[in-house]
Design a protein with these regions (language model features):
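Transmembrane beta-barrel architecture of outer-membrane proteins
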Residues: 5-9, 52-54, 98-102, 138-142, ...
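A short, polar/proline- and glycine-enriched secondary-structure boundary/capping micro-motif
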Residues: 32-35, 81-82, 126-127, 169
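Alpha-helix capping and helix-loop boundary segments enriched in small/acidic/polar residues
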Residues: 47, 89-93, 135
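C-terminal/domain-terminus segments
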Residues: 2, 76-91, 95-96, 212-234
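Outer membrane beta-barrel
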Residues: 1-79, 97-98, 102-113, 149-159
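Active-site-proximal beta-alpha loop/turn segments in soluble metabolic enzymes
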Residues: 40-41, 76-90, 122-132
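Detector for outer-membrane/organellar transmembrane beta-barrel domains
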Residues: 108-236
Length: 237
């Protein structure tokens, strides 16, 4: 057997009175540490809630004592999009010079945490297709929102997300491949939507709770030749 050291989180932050700059590897911006499923299982609501971490640079600006705006650029590493024909592990990230761009507005008070965010990702699955040079990209947008209310008796959380090619967030979906007349494969993302609700007691010793999650794969345009995604029929998903 072989033992390996696995780096999950390693960051540094430069702080000023109203501005902070963080760089390193930490949670995806869509995984909100204050608002994630409080299930007993270690999977933290995977498939309904984003999961994973990536190398990133984040700039956070305080607009008021409770309201902040974060701008983030990150690159997938350990968690990645699906591999197209001719691709190797994480080649879609390596081939793309543009990082994933993310913006998030968050309100945080003593009892309420709420936020809205958006993300744009442009990946290049391969640099060669059908023996020809390829610069075809799979472009996608994503939008999400969340809310948490907590007092001395109750904790209530809600989260919703919708967008294309959410495979790297350990959710269903990915992208489809389309054959062009010249043989080069082009790509379009598949759309995934998910939401969840988590209600639990705030008791310090025994805290019963209930979690409900729903996710839907809305597919993509017709005429595709190949599917590169999680959540389709097969021996492995």
């Amino acid at each position: 057997s072989t033992g390996l050291l696995r780096l999950r989180h390693a960051t540094a932050t430069l702080s000023w009175p109203k501005t902070a700059v963080t760089f390193g590897q930490t949670w995806y911006p869509t995984f909100v540490p204050e608002v994630f499923p409080g299930v007993v299982n270690f999977n933290t609501g995977i498939m309904f809630n984003p999961f994973g971490w990536a190398g990133q640079v984040k700039v956070t600006q305080k607009l008021t004592p409770e309201l902040s705006l974060s701008l983030i650029a990150y690159k997938d590493r350990e968690f990645q999009t699906a591999n197209a024909i001719g691709a190797s592990a994480n080649s879609a990230t390596f081939n793309s010079s543009m990082p994933t761009l993310h913006s998030q507005l968050q309100y945080k008070s003593k009892s309420i945490t709420a936020g809205l965010g958006a993300e744009y990702q442009s990946m290049q699955p391969v640099i060669e297709s059908a023996g020809l040079a390829s610069d075809e990209k799979v472009n996608s947008e994503m939008f999400f929102g969340y809310f948490k209310y907590a007092n001395e008796k109750l904790i209530a959380k809600l989260y919703g997300i919708t967008g294309g090619n959410l495979h790297h967030l350990v959710m269903i979906g990915g992208f489809a491949g389309y054959e062009n007349p010249n043989g080069i494969e082009s790509y379009k993302s598949t759309k995934t939507s998910a939401f969840w609700v988590d209600l639990s007691s705030a008791h310090s010793k025994i805290a019963p709770g209930i979690f409900f999650g729903y996710t839907k794969n809305s597919g993509t345009e017709a005429g595709f030749k190949n599917l590169y995604m999680r959540g389709v029929s097969g021996s492995r998903i």
